[in-house]
UniProtKB/Swiss-Prot annotation:
Gene3D superfamilies, per the entry: Sodium/glucose cotransporter
Gene name of this polypeptide: SLC5A12
The protein's role, per its UniProt record: Acts as an electroneutral and low-affinity sodium (Na(+))-dependent sodium-coupled solute transporter. Catalyzes the transport across the plasma membrane of many monocarboxylates such as lactate, pyruvate, nicotinate, propionate, butyrate and beta-D-hydroxybutyrate. May be responsible for the first step of reabsorption of monocarboxylates from the lumen of the proximal tubule of the kidney and the small intestine. May play also a role in monocarboxylates transport in the retina. Mediates electroneutral uptake of lactate, with a stoichiometry of 2 Na(+) for each lactate.
Name the record gives this protein: Sodium-coupled monocarboxylate transporter 2
Alphabetic keyword roster: Cell membrane, Glycoprotein, Ion transport, Membrane, Sodium, Sodium transport, Symport, Transmembrane, Transmembrane helix, Transport
């Protein structure tokens, strides 16, 4: 394809993004230099307000994968992606009401500390290793996506832009810690929205108005959103997105270190919940912008598809190619779009680096060397940020082999996030599950999700389940037009038509449900965990969310865990005292090899006023 070059103003706009992002890191490095503690560096001293945290949460997972991948997906497969509107709502409600209260009230820094408190160290370490692998792989995809966009629209060296992204993210993460990451994310979120709106306004104007865009999309069957086919092999249906998508995104939001780390950095639990709910508005806005961008792109290319005509070589190049055509006579605006794509990437990569440094320090370094000074702890945390910045940037090389960025990213989250969601669900929702069941469940979930995902990579799903909607090249007028036809599949085993053909959104469903089922069964076979041995702040049965269930049923769900639901409101009103007490209890628990086996409700280290205030729901 012909490479269209940036004008001077495009470079100015694009460079401004990097300069401002780096400047925020320098600002917080100088401002917080006298607060040299690992707590301040990793969780912002737990004094953040909900506004910037909400923007940061949205920016962290609405990356260049969303900016480039979602419009391309809508262009090829239709607007069914908008059903994630429902998915996001369910995920945020479950996260804020089910998972967040447990993590926030436990006083933890790493979500995997919870697993040691609830089960033991082996479970904690196994989960931490899986999270590290998952995050490094996902970050590689996120770094590669905007680098590809920049390469296509400017001819700028692909790997040069990859390393530029990694260097800037690592720079402000290492200097400024979580506060720098959160405030930089907030700035980048604004850039993302402005970039999307610019494309939508100019694109719909060029197409003759929004009404004409929707009419063209309807004629091209792009608005057939509500497909209620229950076949789990279909790539995107109402049920695939609402069920499989919920499991996938709950793994991202409900138990993911990057999300929870921001929530527990808030000054109160109320602020943490507000951050999640305001973040939901951001998710919806970005989703709608991305979907309408895809529809606008279809209205523009409906008679000459650049992908099947051979003008571009991959679907993820559609959006940058569209932008360069749209703004070819408007210097600065192509640079704004690329800044939009890079904003999503910078925020996601920074969040990943910060989260990786946190879990590595808390789960490995601190547990091995508990007497480190604050100054040394801070320097080690910064060193870990630098190390993971290098690793994540290097992993982007492998991302070029993964195909479409949106499917690759969500597949990675599904393969690892589903079993992790199942593991935390076992700990929080099922008081009777023991550490043997938890560990066996995690391994079972990982094996199942990787089995189906790797099988799908080797034996791609049949074209009838994944082939795009019709695309036209009638008015391209090119001699090298190629017609896109379904690939001819060689001899395939029967399992490739069923198990391996499962929608990528169900990888998380398989991993989570497999983990829970195995965990419950193994716990029954090896001896159930005694409820009286578990501190009640580590448990939150689903029955606790519904006031209409009888007291007898609620007592049954708690499985013998000693608690007093009557003081829950008092706990929320005394949040600061409660949080301090929780952290004290946390340290008592982490000093033991495993809190649960040796827990004694009569022990003086647990029986104090602070704990009485924090351990009731």
């Amino acid at each position: 394809m012909e490479v269209k070059n940036f004008a001077v103003w495009d470079y100015v706009v694009f460079a401004a993004l990097f300069i401002i992002s780096s400047g925020i890191g320098v600002f917080y490095a100088i401002k917080e230099r006298k607060k040299a503690t690992s707590r301040e560096f990793l969780v912002g001293g737990r004094q953040m307000s909900f506004g910037p945290v909400a923007l940061s949460l949205t920016a962290s997972f609405m990356s260049a994968v969303t900016v480039l991948g979602t419009p391309a997906d809508v262009y090829r497969f239709g607007a069914s992606f908008v059903l994630f509107f429902i998915t996001y709502g369910l995920v945020i409600i479950l996260t804020s009401e089910l998972f967040l209260p447990v993590f926030y009230r436990s006083g933890i820094t790493s979500t995997y500390e919870y697993l040691q408190l609830r089960f033991n160290k082996p479970v904690r370490y196994a989960a931490t290793v899986i999270y590290i692998v998952q995050t490094i792989l996902y970050t590689g995809v996120v770094v590669y996506a905007p680098a590809l966009a920049l390469n296509q629209v400017t001819g700028f060296d692909l790997w040069g832009s990859v390393f530029a992204t990694g260097i800037v993210c690592t720079f402000y993460c290492t200097l400024g810690g979580l506060k720098a990451v959160v405030w930089t994310d907030a700035f980048q979120m604004v850039v993302m929205i402005v970039g999307f709106l610019t494309v939508l306004i100019q694109g719909s104007t060029y197409a003759g108005g929004l009404h004409n865009v929707l009419e063209q999309a309807e004629n091209g069957s792009r608005l057939n959103i509500f497909d209620f086919d229950i076949d789990p092999l279909r790539r995107h249906t109402f049920w695939t997105i609402s069920v499989g998508g919920t499991f996938t995104w709950l793994g991202i939001y409900g138990v993911n270190q990057s999300t929870i780390q921001r929530c527990i950095s808030c000054k109160t639990e109320k602020h943490a919940k507000l951050a999640l709910y305001f973040n939901l508005l951001g998710l919806w806005i970005i989703l709608l912008c991305a979907v309408f961008s895809g529809l606008t792109m279809y209205a523009h290319f409906k008679d000459c598809d650049p992908w099947t005509s051979g003008i571009i070589s991959a679907p993820d190049q559609l959006m940058p190619y569209f932008v360069m055509e749209l703004f070819s006579t408007m210097p600065g605006l192509p640079g704004l779009f690329v800044a939009c794509a890079f904003s999503g990437t910078l925020s996601t990569v920074a969040a990943s680096i910060n989260a990786l440094a946190t879990v590595t320090f808390e789960d490995f370094v601190k547990s091995c060397f508990p007497r480190l000074s604050d100054k040394l702890s801070t320097w080690i945390s910064k060193g870990l940020c630098l190390l993971f910045g290098v690793i994540c940037t290097s992993t982007a090389v492998a991302a070029s082999l993964m195909g479409g960025v949106i499917q690759a990213a969500l597949s990675i989250h599904g393969m690892c996030g589903g079993p992790m969601l199942g593991l935390f669900s076992l700990g929080i929702l099922f008081p009777f599950v023991n550490w043997k069941g938890a560990l066996a469940g995690l391994l079972t979930g990982i094996l199942l999700s990787f089995w189906v995902a790797i099988g799908a990579f080797i034996y791609p799903a049949p074209a009838s389940k994944t082939w795009p909607l019709p695309l036209s090249t009638d008015q391209c007028g090119l001699s090298n037009v190629t017609e896109s036809v379904p690939p001819v599949l060689s001899s395939r085993p029967a399992i490739a038509e069923t198990w391996y053909a499962l929608s990528y959104l169900h990888y998380s469903t398989v991993g989570c449900l497999g983990c829970i089922a195995a965990g419950v069964i193994i716990s029954f076979l090896t001896g159930l965990q005694k409820g009286k041995d578990i501190p009640p702040l580590l448990i939150r049965p689903v029955c606790n969310l519904f006031c209409f269930w009888s007291k007898k049923y609620k007592t049954l769900c708690w499985c013998g865990v000693q608690h007093d639901s009557g003081t829950e409101q008092e706990n929320l009103e005394n949040d600061s005292t409660w949080k301090q007490g929780a952290e004290s209890v946390l340290q008592n628990g982490l000093k033991q090899e495993s809190l649960v086996p040796g827990y004694d409700p009569k022990d003086k280290s647990y029986d104090n006023m602070a704990l009485e205030k924090i351990t009731h729901f």
